[in-house]
Amino acid sequence: MATSSMSKGCFVFKPNSKKRKISLPIEDYFNKGKNEPEDSKLRFETYQLIWQQMKSENERLQEELNKNLFDNLIEFLQKSHSGFQKNSRDLGGQIKLREIPTAALVLGVNVTDHDLTFGSLTEALQNNVTPYVVSLQAKDCPDMKHFLQKLISQLMDCCVDIKSKEEESVHVTQRKTHYSMDSLSSWYMTVTQKTDPKMLSKKRTTSSQWQSPPVVVILKDMESFATKVLQDFIIISSQHLHEFPLILIFGIATSPIIIHRLLPHAVSSLLCIELFQSLSCKEHLTTVLDKLLLTTQFPFKINEKVLQVLTNIFLYHDFSVQNFIKGLQLSLLEHFYSQPLSVLCCNLPEAKRRINFLSNNQCENIRRLPSFRRYVEKQASEKQVALLTNERYLKEETQLLLENLHVYHMNYFLVLRCLHKFTSSLPKYPLGRQIRELYCTCLEKNIWDSEEYASVLQLLRMLAKDELMTILEKCFKVFKSYCENHLGSTAKRIEEFLAQFQSLDETKEEEDASGSQPKGLQKTDLYHLQKSLLEMKELRRSKKQTKFEVLRENVVNFIDCLVREYLLPPETQPLHEVVYFSAAHALREHLNAAPRIALHTALNNPYYYLKNEALKSEEGCIPNIAPDICIAYKLHLECSRLINLVDWSEAFATVVTAAEKMDANSATSEEMNEIIHARFIRAVSELELLGFIKPTKQKTDHVARLTWGGC
């Protein structure tokens, strides 16, 4: 490698390839404990496959849920744009052009999901309405200058094709420092004149729209925009509306009333507002659960505690469906990482194939499962010996148990949906209004042992004929869609109930019931009145049930039998640990982290995170090789409300130089003291940044301590 040169220069040489750090594949990090590398790689690949399938299903579901909303928005924009073209040719319609078409899009308080929705909306508008779609956020537009700057700069990037982009580059550079509505109007006229509608008609449905495509401005978080900025922009835009078609979309998280609170009547009258409501986040979550968890399409499941952690974060923190899905992904990852037998958490044919190739260690892992041990204890003594000693017999039995678990899930979700059809129509919703609430209860315990279930049966025995028939028709559709399952006979039984209800002669029943009733009470004293009431009560008890009441009782008993037979908790099923993730504490540590406790642990015991053996120390001791901030933090824990900086600095220097022998009069010692002093200042500044201390006006050479209790 020659470095000779006629002039001074900097020479760069690539390092030796042998010295480069070789990065390990991801599946190697997936290995834990004594598990075999081949098995860890297979588990990682299975995790990736299942997550990719769940992710694709969620994306498809998201598009399906947004389709109706986006279609209505696109129809509104196209209608507003056609109105602009019509009025631009009509002199009498110039007054209407003062009103800006505005779509008020209410998305709910799940703000973290809005970016995904607006991204999909922007793509849909660019594909169906106009290429000129701009998304603005309040943090980027503190005043009118920045508002116009962001608006125009984004619009100039929205070029229709490469040719127009090249032609516009000259004009953009000439006016890049001048942002106003006049420049925007001039730019729009230039772009629309240069755009060839014949070339672009292939990309859109009608070429007439491309002669003057609208400019769509999306304000993602309208509540956060400054009132003056909004008012000025709307007033100025209304004056230029005859020059280019402008359409506004307000992203609203709270309520449409915010429009009238932010904008006075003189400004809001310049808007032609139409309201659009997205699906509520709770309904969205219910749909996601129904498609991802309440199905046999995906083998992975979570138990009641994990589901409770995820739903609590959703309900009490952010209402974010995307964060819920991320938590579900983390649960999937933790399950495949921590459970060696998760290699069998796949579709049933593949799981049966993998069972034949299980190693001896994996067979022992199966025998150690609590659910399998309970299953073995219930078997005969000969079968117990075979399960514990014969590997081949164990694999055959494992295949059978996994097949039974698959059938259990199919029946479980069918009966769960059927029960939800009944409970969701009852007053006060004893078992919850959403199916996720019913699912949580069924996962936790035997639902028929709860008081809420008893009240449900009591209310079902009071349903009218029309209500009961409506619910049975819904249940019939649920079971009819799974005829291949042995529960398909249940659909025939429900169909028989419906036929019996339709054949009832209500008129005759009412006449018979009215004929058996006693005559009306006459005026009498208290004694005879009480006697008559007692006779009526006894008569009501001994009264024969009508055909409808008998049939209704049969329906309730039939549903009760289904629930008791098929809605058993998952913990009762052998090998449920293979597909169910139950480590709720691990999930809570990741998703519900406590920053203050983590900070205290890191500063008080750096070995906990750094895993450096030299940092190990007895409780109460301060190792001198610990990070400076850790030393300063442990010293500040020994102080009271006010900390003397001089004393703190001396104690810090004493700890740092504890293992070093230096001459106090040497030049090296003075340089070392300066370095230690600088390190102390940096450590104190870091503690102040973290919020442990703050300056105080009581004493200039002191700082105030802000935390107590060791965390």
From Swiss-Prot:
Q: Does this UniProt record's set of keywords contain Nucleus?
A: yes
InterPro entries given for it?
ORC3, ORC3_ins, ORC3_N, ORC_WH_C
A cellular component term, taken from the record's GO annotations: nuclear origin of replication recognition complex
Output one GO BP term.
neural precursor cell proliferation
Post-translational modification as stated in the protein's UniProt record = Multi-mono-ubiquitinated by OBI1; ubiquitination is important for efficient DNA replication origin site activation. Ubiquitination levels are low in mitotic and early G1-phAse cells and are induced in late G1-/early S-phase, peaking in S-phase and decrease toward the end of the cell cycle.
Could you tell me one molecular function GO term of this UniProt entry?
DNA replication origin binding
Q: Which Pfam families match?
A: ORC3_ins, ORC3_N, ORC_WH_C
Ranges in coiled-coil conformation: none
At the top level, the lineage of the source is Eukaryota
Tell where it localizes: Nucleus; Chromosome
Q: Does the keyword Transport apply?
A: no
- Modification Phosphoserine, positions: 23, 516
Supply the alphabetized keyword list.
Answer: Chromosome, DNA replication, DNA-binding, Nucleus, Phosphoprotein, Ubl conjugation
Q: Which family does it belong to?
A: Belongs to the ORC3 family.
What job does the chain carry out?
A: Component of the origin recognition complex (ORC) that binds origins of replication. DNA-binding is ATP-dependent. The specific DNA sequences that define origins of replication have not been identified yet. ORC is required to assemble the pre-replication complex necessary to initiate DNA replication. Binds histone H3 and H4 trimethylation marks H3K9me3, H3K27me3 and H4K20me3.
Give the record's subunit note: Component of ORC, a complex composed of at least 6 subunits: ORC1, ORC2, ORC3, ORC4, ORC5 and ORC6. ORC is regulated in a cell-cycle dependent manner. It is sequentially assembled at the exit from anaphase of mitosis and disassembled as cells enter S phase.
- Name of the protein described by the UniProt record: Origin recognition complex subunit 3
What organism is the protein native to? Homo sapiens (Human)
